[in-house]
């Protein structure tokens, strides 16, 4: 009698654990995600979307895969949290870019880079200009958290 009760309890536990996921191919698909907000940014190659958690991203992907739509992959959070601006210099208040101590000759080769400071996202013609830009920002009094970093070595 005790072994039957133990077996029944084990089966109930297994059913409870696996009852929250559905499998499509090799991917476990959660049907229930805890209400814990730990945002994750995802991309399907064209669009960026913020999900409440990794679990929500996986669940969303399972529904997309069933419809043969490209799944979202987790990516840098700055893609979802930053505003894309065309003219970064103007957006930041037209600070002085021509600072003697910041001048570093850059090639005229167009190799666009996408940069961000977490708040704004923009494109520069090449990565050398990013160094000059950040130097000029520092001279104008910008805090380290306001400086820009490379998001990817291509257009945004």
Curated annotation (Swiss-Prot):
Assigned keywords, A-Z: Disulfide bond, Protease inhibitor, Repeat, Serine protease inhibitor, Signal
Task: Name residues in a coiled coil.
Answer: none
User: Which stretches make up the Kazal-like domain?
Assistant: 23-81, 96-156
Q: Where is this site: Reactive bond?
A: 35-36, 108-109
Q: Where is the signal peptide?
A: 1-19
Which SUPFAM superfamilies does the record associate with it? Kazal-type serine protease inhibitors (SSF100895)
* GO MF assignments: serine-type endopeptidase inhibitor activity
Instruction: Identify the InterPro entries for this entry.
Output: Kazal_dom (IPR002350), Kazal_dom_sf (IPR036058)
Q: Which cysteines are joined by disulfide bonds?
A: 29-62, 33-55, 102-135, 106-128, 114-156
Note whether Disulfide bond occurs among the keywords.
Answer: yes
Specify the protein name. Answer: Enhancer of split M1 protein
Organism annotation:
Drosophila melanogaster (Fruit fly)
The gene name reads Kaz-m1
């Amino acid at each position: 009698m005790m072994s039957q009760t133990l077996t029944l309890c084990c089966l109930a536990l297994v059913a409870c654990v696996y009852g929250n996921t559905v499998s499509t191919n090799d991917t476990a698909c959660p049907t229930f995600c805890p209400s814990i907000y730990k945002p994750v940014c995802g991309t399907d190659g064209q669009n960026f979307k913020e999900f409440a958690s990794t679990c929500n991203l996986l669940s969303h992907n399972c529904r997309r895969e069933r419809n043969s739509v490209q799944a979202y992959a987790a990516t840098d959070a700055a893609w979802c949290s930053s505003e894309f601006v065309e003219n970064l210099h103007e957006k930041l208040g037209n600070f002085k870019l021509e600072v003697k101590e910041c001048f570093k000759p850059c090639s005229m080769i167009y190799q666009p880079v996408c940069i961000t400071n977490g708040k704004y996202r923009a494109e520069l013609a090449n990565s050398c200009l990013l160094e000059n830009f950040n130097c000029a920002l520092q001279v104008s009094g910008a805090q380290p958290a306001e400086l820009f970093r490379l998001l990817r070595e291509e257009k945004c």
